[in-house]
């Protein structure tokens, strides 16, 4: 299974800590995880082509105030190009009105609400275990069921930060 974690940054010089933390915290899983970083200044078609060229089975997209309008344009396009790809959105722009977002974008299978390192990891593990959407019950994961109903789970916060694998210092230094 191939997973593509995608960040659409505000500027070319920005880097996403979010996808790096997700990547680092999912390293124990038996799947191929790649990261793609682009900026809101990239053309929509170019971003869609980069995602298509990666041929992910699962696409994770970080949604923030600076990229949400581009993400909303990108989702239907990616779904047309990769109709069997599971789409997972996360970030503050999809965490508060999750049900409405998922109703507006029926191609989105899951939304990670709140802190994503553990929730995304657990969701990937469930998908690797071939669980169907109805079987998946993970704190912080909203999901679309086979009958198109949407189950929202409360966003979670991590109370013990030692549960989250930190980025190595060399990666942090590279991002400065």
What positions do the PLM features span?
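Short beta-strand segments enriched in small/hydrophobic residues
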Residues: 2-9
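Glycine-rich beta-alpha loop elements in corrinoid/cobalamin-binding modules
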Residues: 2, 18, 25-26, 32-160
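Short N-terminal binding/cap micro-motifs at the start of the first secondary-structure element
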Residues: 12-18
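Radical SAM [4Fe-4S] cluster-binding motif and immediate context
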Residues: 162-176
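Residue-level signal for short, function-critical loop segments
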Residues: 9-11, 65
């Amino acid at each position: 299974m191939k997973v593509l974690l995608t960040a659409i940054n505000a500027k070319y010089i920005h880097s996403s800590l979010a996808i790096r933390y997700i990547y680092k915290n999912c390293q124990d899983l038996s799947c191929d995880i790649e990261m793609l970083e682009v900026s809101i200044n990239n053309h929509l078609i170019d971003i869609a082509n980069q995602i298509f060229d990666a041929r992910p089975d699962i696409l994770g997209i970080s949604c923030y105030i600076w990229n949400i309008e581009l993400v909303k344009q990108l989702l239907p396009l990616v779904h047309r190009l990769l109709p069997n790809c599971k789409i997972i959105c996360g970030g503050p722009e999809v965490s508060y009105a999750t049900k409405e977002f998922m109703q507006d974008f029926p191609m989105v299978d899951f939304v990670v609400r709140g802190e994503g390192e553990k929730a995304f990891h657990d969701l990937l593990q469930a998908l690797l275990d071939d669980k169907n959407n109805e079987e998946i019950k993970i704190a912080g994961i909203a999901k679309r069921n086979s009958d198109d109903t949407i189950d929202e789970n409360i966003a979670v916060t991590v109370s013990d930060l030692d549960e989250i694998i930190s980025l190595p210092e060399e990666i942090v230094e590279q991002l400065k």
